[in-house]
């Protein structure tokens, strides 16, 4: 549908001012947006992608569930992202059986149920919400202290957007990715099925992020084309492991 915007605009009697906004875009994506909308010499504003209050963690645990249980604290608003509805329900069920005030959220639930789960999380009636990426679009809960990815996302853009739901109040918050070889195998299989070359390139960037020994914050900022990137942020898994 985005690709049809220029056709629509061209049919108007007078071309209006066209403005485009996005939360996360690499230099290549920004160039593509300008081409798709046929923007001629646009005024471009790119703000910093750096969120100094966020700690970025990367872990490859032997047992993801055991590690997840260690990370979750009582009365600490936490979002756990999983890649599939089945995984969401499975993980949430295990948390509930451990006495954790948690509920799940995905697009397979009715609008009424989704609305109820959102309200329970926003008003602190539950501590943890386990969700697919269907959660969070338009949801702004400022005091989320942890965003934990139980599975590796398919691309860095998705990861950054989802992790960015932590610490919107400006207070310290943690973004932790738990990944394993199984995540890589499943994601590669799914992308290959769709014969998506661009998707595979993005997935490989995500895998590189998981395996890099450089500063995680610097890796992401570099990916989004930000300049003046610190070599050592002192606030991610890799930088702290150097100490």
Give residue ranges: language-model regions:
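Cys/His-rich short segments
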Residues: 202, 207-243
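Helicase motor core with emphasis on the C-terminal RecA-like subdomain
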Residues: 1-201, 226-230, 237-238
């Amino acid at each position: 549908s985005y690709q049809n915007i220029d056709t629509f605009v061209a049919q108007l009697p007078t071309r209006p001012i066209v403005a485009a906004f996005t939360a996360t875009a690499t230099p290549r994506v920004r160039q593509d947006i300008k081409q798709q909308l046929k923007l001629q010499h646009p005024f471009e504003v790119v703000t910093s992608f750096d969120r100094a209050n966020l700690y970025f963690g990367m872990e490859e645990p032997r047992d993801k569930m055991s590690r997840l249980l260690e990370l979750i604290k009582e009365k600490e608003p936490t979002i756990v992202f999983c890649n599939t509805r089945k995984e969401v329900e499975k993980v949430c069920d295990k948390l509930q059986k451990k006495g954790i005030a948690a509920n799940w959220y995905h697009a397979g639930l009715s609008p009424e149920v989704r609305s109820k789960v959102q309200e329970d999380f926003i008003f602190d009636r539950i501590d943890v919400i386990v969700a697919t990426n269907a959660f969070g679009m338009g949801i702004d809960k400022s005091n989320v202290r942890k965003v934990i990815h139980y599975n590796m996302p398919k691309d860095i853009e998705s990861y950054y957007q989802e992790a960015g739901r932590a610490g919107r109040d400006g207070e310290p918050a943690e973004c932790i990715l738990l990944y394993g070889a199984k995540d890589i195998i499943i994601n590669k299989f799914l992308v290959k099925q769709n014969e998506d070359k661009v998707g595979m390139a993005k997935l490989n960037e995500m895998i590189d992020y998981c395996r890099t020994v450089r500063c995680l914050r610097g890796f992401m900022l570099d990916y989004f084309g930000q300049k003046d990137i610190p070599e050592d942020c002192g606030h991610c898994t890799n930088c702290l492991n150097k100490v």
